[in-house]
C-alpha cells in the first residue's frame, strides 16, 4: 500500500457506499456469497470469473432495508495504508445514525464525516467507551445559524430552528416527500407523487445563499452552505497540516464529484452516472477506474494505489 515516502500524498478521503461497502445488485454480477467463513463473523464471497474466495463482513441493514458487505482484504489494506503514514478519512452522505451503527464494520480511520460534511468526528483515546470518538465542535458550530445548535438534534425536524428547517417546513407544506429521519444537518428529497426532476431543479436554483444541495442516487440532499464534502475536507486537511492537492479520493457517485475536482487523484471502483462519466472524460489523467465491480473492484484499486500515487500516472 501507500508508504510515507510518497510525501506528495498524505491524506486519503474515502466514500463508503458503493466504494468500500457494496450491495447485492452490484455484487451479484461478479460472484455470490456461498456461506459462513471459518473466520468468526465472516462470510465467503466467491468471484464468478476466477473462483477466488474473498472473506466479507455483512453490515447491519440501512434504514432503507439494504444490507451491504465489506471485504476483509479492504479493511486490511486500508490499515496498511495508515501504517504507511497516510491519514484516512471516511466521508459519506449517510445520516449520523447510519454511520454510527456501521462503525464496528468499517475501517479504523483518522476522521469520520457524515451527512455530506455536516458532522466530523475524530478518534479520542482518552474516552473509556466502546467507540472512542469525539465530535469536532468547532466545525459543528459553523452550521448553528442554518441547521440549529447541536442540542436541537433531539427536536423533531419540523420544529428545529434554522434556515435549513424552514425550507423543510416549506417543502412539507407543498407536498414533497422528504426524509429527515435521524438526520441532524441535512435532509433528503425525492421527486415522486407527481413531482418531477425539473421541480427539484427549481428548488435548487432558488435556494437561499446559506443553503447548498447535491444529488446522490437520484435524490437531492439539502444542507448548510457552510457544510458539504469539499468544505469538510478543506477543514480536515488544515487540521492535518496538509492541502487538498496532497489528498486522493476513493469514490463512486455524483455527490463525490465536487471533492474529486479539488483533490490530486481519484480512484473509482465503478462509474455510476453520466455526471461521473463526464468528469472522467474531461480529465482522464486524474481518474483511475476499475474494470471490475463490487468488492473485487475495491480490492483491485487498493492493490494498485501505491503505483498510481507514486508515479501520478494512469496504470
Language model region names:
Residues 10-12, 110, 247:
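The start of beta-strands in P-loop NTPase/AAA+ ATPase cores
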Residues 23-24, 30, 99-102, 123-124, ...:
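Short glycine-/acidic-enriched loop or helix-start segments at secondary-structure transitions
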Residues 7, 222-223, 230-315:
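Mg2+-dependent phosphoryl-transfer enzymes with acidic/Ser/Thr/Gly-rich catalytic loops
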Residues 9, 85, 109, 116, ...:
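Short, well-ordered alpha-helix to beta-strand connector turns
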Residues 159-263:
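Conserved acidic, metal-coordinating active-site core of Asp-based
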Residues 22-58, 107-121, 125-126, 159-167, ...:
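A metal-dependent, Asp-based hydrolase signature
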Residues 2-90, 97-98:
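Active-site neighborhood of HAD-like aspartate-dependent phosphohydrolases
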Residues 66-179, 271:
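Active-site phosphate-binding/coordination module
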Amino acid at each position: 500500500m501507500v508508504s510515507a515516502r510518497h510525501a506528495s500524498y498524505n491524506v486519503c478521503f474515502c466514500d463508503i457506499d458503493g466504494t468500500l461497502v457494496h450491495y447485492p445488485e452490484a455484487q451479484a454480477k461478479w460472484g455470490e456469497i456461498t456461506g459462513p467463513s471459518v473466520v468468526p463473523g465472516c462470510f465467503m464471497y466467491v468471484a464468478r470469473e476466477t473462483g477466488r474466495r474473498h472473506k466479507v463482513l455483512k453490515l447491519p441493514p440501512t434504514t432503507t432495508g439494504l444490507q451491504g458487505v465489506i471485504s476483509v482484504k479492504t479493511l486490511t489494506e486500508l490499515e496498511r495504508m495508515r501504517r504507511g503514514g497516510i491519514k484516512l478519512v471516511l466521508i459519506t452522505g449517510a445520516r449520523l445514525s447510519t454511520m454510527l451503527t456501521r462503525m464496528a464494520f468499517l475501517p479504523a480511520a483518522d476522521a469520520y464525516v457524515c451527512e455530506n460534511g455536516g458532522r466530523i468526528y475524530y478518534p479520542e483515546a482518552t474516552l473509556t467507551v466502546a467507540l472512542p470518538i469525539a465530535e469536532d465542535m468547532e466545525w459543528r458550530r459553523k452550521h448553528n445559524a442554518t441547521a440549529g445548535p447541536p442540542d436541537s438534534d433531539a427536536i423533531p425536524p419540523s420544529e428545529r430552528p434554522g434556515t435549513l428547517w424552514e425550507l423543510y417546513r416549506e417543502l412539507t407544506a407543498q407536498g414533497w416527500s422528504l426524509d429527515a429521519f435521524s438526520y441532524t444537518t441535512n435532509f433528503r428529497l425525492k421527486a415522486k407523487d407527481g413531482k418531477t426532476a425539473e421541480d427539484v431543479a427549481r428548488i435548487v436554483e432558488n435556494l437561499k445563499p446559506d443553503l447548498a444541495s447535491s444529488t446522490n442516487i437520484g435524490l437531492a440532499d439539502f444542507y448548510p452552505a457552510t457544510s458539504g464534502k469539499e468544505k469538510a475536507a478543506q477543514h480536515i486537511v488544515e487540521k492535518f497540516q496538509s492541502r487538498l492537492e496532497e489528498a486522493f479520493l476513493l469514490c463512486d457517485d455524483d455527490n463525490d464529484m465536487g471533492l474529486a475536482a479539488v483533490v490530486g487523484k481519484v480512484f473509482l471502483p465503478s462509474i455510476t452516472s453520466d455526471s461521473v462519466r463526464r468528469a472522467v472524460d474531461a480529465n482522464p489523467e486524474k481518474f483511475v477506474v476499475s474494470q471490475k465491480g463490487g468488492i473485487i473492484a475495491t480490492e483491485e484499486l487498493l492493490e494498485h494505489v501505491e503505483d498510481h500515487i507514486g508515479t501520478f500516472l494512469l496504470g
